[in-house]
Regions:
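Receiver (REC) domain active-site loop signature in two-component systems and cognate sites
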Residues: 74
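Active-site beta3 strand of CheY-like receiver
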Residues: 53-69
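Two-component signal transduction core modules
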Residues: 68, 122-123
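Acidic di-acidic motifs
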Residues: 13-18, 41, 71
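Non-catalytic signal-transmission and effector/linker regions of two-component phosphorelay proteins
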Residues: 1-11, 17-32, 61-64, 125-136
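Helix N-cap/capping motif at the beta->alpha junctions
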Residues: 38-51, 79
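Short amphipathic alpha-helix used as the core "switch/output" element in two-component signaling
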Residues: 47, 80-93
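Alpha4 helix (beta4-alpha4-beta5 surface) of REC/receiver domains from two-component response regulators
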Residues: 25, 81, 94-100, 105-122
Length: 136
C-alpha cells in the first residue's frame, strides 16, 4: 500500500447504482484507498466477505475492506439486517471492518439504532463529501 493511501480497500453497499457511481468517484478523488468494492445488495456484500475468508491465502486482513459504507433502505436485506448478518461473521472480519452508515434516512430512530451498534463507526447523511471522508 502506498504511503498516501489511508486504507487498502473500502466497500460501498447501496442498491442505488447512481449513488454507488457518485460515491466511487468521490472516494477515488480523495485517494484514501487502493481498492473500492461495490455491491448493489447487502446479501452479496455479506457473501463477498465470507468468500474472502474462505479463499484468502494468508491473513484475511490483507484482502478485507477496512471501511464499509452501508445504506439503510435496500430491498431484500436492509442495512440493519446486514449488521445482524455481519455479527455472525468471524472475529477476524468483524475486528477488521468498520461500518459507516451512508444513507438518505433522516429518521432519528435509524440514527439512534445505528449509533448503538458496536460495528458502526459513523452515521453520515448522503451525499458523501470530501469533508466526510477526511473525518473517517
Amino acid at each position: 500500500m502506498s504511503a498516501e493511501k489511508k486504507y487498502y480497500a473500502v466497500m460501498l453497499v447501496d442498491d442505488n447504482e447512481i449513488d454507488n457511481l457518485i460515491n466511487q468517484k468521490m472516494i477515488e478523488a480523495s485517494g484514501i484507498c487502493e481498492h473500492i468494492f461495490i455491491h448493489s445488495g447487502a446479501r452479496s456484500a455479506i457473501e463477498f466477505l465470507k468468500n474472502i475468508e474462505k479463499l484468502a491465502k494468508g491473513p484475511v486482513s490483507l484482502y478485507l475492506p477496512e471501511i464499509i459504507f452501508l445504506d439503510i433502505d435496500m430491498p431484500l436485506m436492509d442495512g440493519f439486517q446486514f449488521l445482524e448478518e455481519f455479527d455472525k461473521l468471524s472475529d477476524s472480519i468483524k475486528n477488521h471492518c468498520k461500518v459507516v452508515m451512508l444513507t438518505s434516512s433522516l429518521n432519528p430512530q435509524d440514527m439512534n439504532k445505528a449509533k448503538k451498534n458496536q460495528f458502526v463507526l459513523k452515521y453520515i447523511n448522503k451525499p458523501l463529501t470530501q469533508e466526510n471522508l477526511k473525518k473517517i
